[in-house]
């Protein structure tokens, strides 16, 4: 699929001239619009390899056109890449843990790059789970860290997109071409053939079941815990790896409002090659050995009759993403607020996606010892349209026009024995409609209390509420029987975490110990109604009472988990590192 993106960025900066953050006497708006248009320069194909200081190839390195960030690629397992770029353009070569290089193309068609390790990155602080922070140089486990600076210039829709080609050892593949479709994340390979291989997602310390609706622009950083040492603190839930997500907080100083947006279209540029209707008709005669289709009909098809069903399946699909955010604060209080709307059509007709979300993060330093905060997130996504059977439709009889002379779907071939119907009913929402709605609420609070200079108590609690409604309607035009299904699911997840931390930053004997107590509960309820044998096709899944056959079902499930955890990190002379953790849990 070919993706064409035009990006606009608008920033509004509020300047406050008033002490103690009272209501301002003067409010100054500064508006700046940057419209980035790539110049129409000669494009050349540039190939090369990316290696490290030891001459080993580096897979997954991001290669971008510095002037057009929507034009990019990643290196393969051999460190090789190919990209089309203006002859006087600049390549940006980046990978986690290495220094980014910007290379002038200057008409070169072969460019090899050697990346240098980013030594200063070892002093960066990373989150290792349950709010614990240590320097990268003190890590004994395998952790990949990604900050918002690594992807904020990219037109990302989903959080899991940010991991693609940015976290070493993490395989990210898209599950579907449908708008809003998720990504398959594999951190420690496929541990199960039929079971769940997805990693555990933790957002601001709260275990989350669904990250599909979270806005990528709200992310401050992500840490990926990969090996057994890093994931042990989460027990068997971390068997497939753990992704720790930290959302943005406000910055001290003047309030700032920012609007970011991008727009574009998606198109299928390489269709399945098929014969023309006239070639298909001639092939039928050749297959049958007789003139099944008359020469006069073949002449009509050559003049423009018949149909290539792909012309009816595919379309140019527009999409747009708009993010409005505000942040600011004083010495003691900071805030971050954002709203996001993403709309997209699928390249297959009659399929649409719409997502809205809103976030507020507030932190307050009440005194020298106590800091509190609250994070709220609410979202709704709607995926509507018709299910299209492309594989079957493409192979359908091309001699049959989509509709008959009365404008109805043509479900019978013109010539007996040639084809057996029309795929058009599979595309019409009046005959085959699907509607999936997801509502999500995430709310969490925390309190940090410094008992002494070395001992800190952290108490946090959070809840995630998910409501899912999946509806499907299929008329008798599709499979001979009118059917409808409506399924509602409600899930509530609660978590309370209490952590006591002792930390000594002595350069010769750095020591940190954590003791954690955690309680979790998850409850899921569902209701399902099915209906068939409707008295008329002019119905949908909202009129189940008009069906001759009706059935209902319901159920619920409950899970509870209580855990105790102890973890020690010790660094001797900044050379010898020791990490140990033990976890005990009970579940019901």
Task: Annotate each PLM feature.
Residues 443-449, 463:
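Alpha-helical support elements that line or immediately flank enzyme active sites
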Residues 1-359, 364-367, 371-379, 442, ...:
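Short, small/polar-rich motifs associated with maturation and membrane association
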Residues 75, 318, 492, 556-560, ...:
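Short secondary-structure boundary/capping elements
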